[in-house]
Amino acid sequence: MALDFLAGCAGGVAGVLVGHPFDTVKVRLQVQSVEKPQYRGTLHCFQAIIKQESVLGLYRGLGSPLLGLTFINALVFGVQGNTLRALGRDSPLNQFLAGAAAGAIQCVICCPMELAKTRLQLQEAGPARTYRGPLDCLAQIYRQEGLRGVNRGMVSTLLRETPSFGVYFLTYDVLTRALGCEPGDRLLVPKLLLAGGTSGIASWLSTYPVDVVKSRLQADGLQGAPRYRGIVDCVQQSYREEGWRVFTRGLASTLLRAFPVNAATFATVTVVLSYARGEEARLEGDAGSAALAQPSSL
């Protein structure tokens, strides 16, 4: 159990390092003004950030997801595994339900973490920055808006994370069964990369419009008076001003990010588990018994 958790954390770190630049681009595209858009698309956004802020601009707000990573993985692994055992049978439906439960519970950490990440990604570079880092960002929000401000976007985060984690674990379970992912298979790692990457894409496609609303709510008021009264008002205003396409803004960068992030996550998890269990077998004097371990979840 502890080894799985450690491997999951290592995989999560790898996933964040690979995917954060894409996430920065996604957020900036989602919240930019339709009247005066700063970026023409995903590629132009990448180029503009690097030109104006250097490559480090793509990693703005990185501290927030890294800071919450250990706790989020603990919740996801623990809740998903315990829920699956409580349901009594490892079936696709139970994988969905266990994943949905894990997604809902980890919102307690995910929502404030993403709020800080979004604010840091959107602030301008330079000495006049509002926030010095994720903790300073959350501390300032708490002083100004209280606990409610720190949890801004919680409902939309729940609406996104609950079904998306369910879809993720369901897709991953179906694909690993179909691909025949078994310990000792020499193609296990490529199969896990394919299953994990595809599952990540499926989970994002299932709830992406909700993510757009969540980003807008969490960025609301950063550059002036708040515009939205809540989720429904945000949806109505966004649709009225920009049409249905607003709910797919930044989707390209998100899907570009989804596959490599999950590929990096599962490759790292597999390597860590294999090395650790190989060491265990060596210490026990039975090196031949250490099979390549398949991670149980993201």
Curated annotation (Swiss-Prot):
Keyword Transmembrane applies: yes
Gene3D superfamilies, A to Z: Mitochondrial carrier domain (1.50.40.10)
Location of this chain's protein in the cell: Mitochondrion inner membrane
GO BP of this protein: L-arginine transmembrane transport; L-histidine transmembrane transport; L-lysine transmembrane transport; mitochondrial L-ornithine transmembrane transport; ornithine transport
Catalytic reaction(s) noted: L-lysine(out) + L-arginine(in) = L-lysine(in) + L-arginine(out); L-histidine(out) + L-arginine(in) = L-histidine(in) + L-arginine(out); L-ornithine(in) + L-arginine(out) = L-ornithine(out) + L-arginine(in); L-homoarginine(in) + L-arginine(out) = L-homoarginine(out) + L-arginine(in)
Single GO MF annotation: high-affinity L-arginine transmembrane transporter activity
Recorded topology in the membrane: Multi-pass membrane protein
GO cellular component, one term: mitochondrial inner membrane
Similarity annotation: Belongs to the mitochondrial carrier (TC 2.A.29) family.
Function recorded in the entry: Mitochondrial transporter of arginine, lysine, homoarginine, methylarginine and, to a much lesser extent, ornithine and histidine. Does not transport carnitine nor acylcarnitines. Functions by both counter-exchange and uniport mechanisms. Plays a physiological role in the import of basic amino acids into mitochondria for mitochondrial protein synthesis and amino acid degradation.
Name of this protein: Mitochondrial basic amino acids transporter
Species this protein is from: Bos taurus (Bovine)
Source organism phylogeny: Eukaryota, Metazoa, Chordata, Craniata, Vertebrata
Gene: SLC25A29
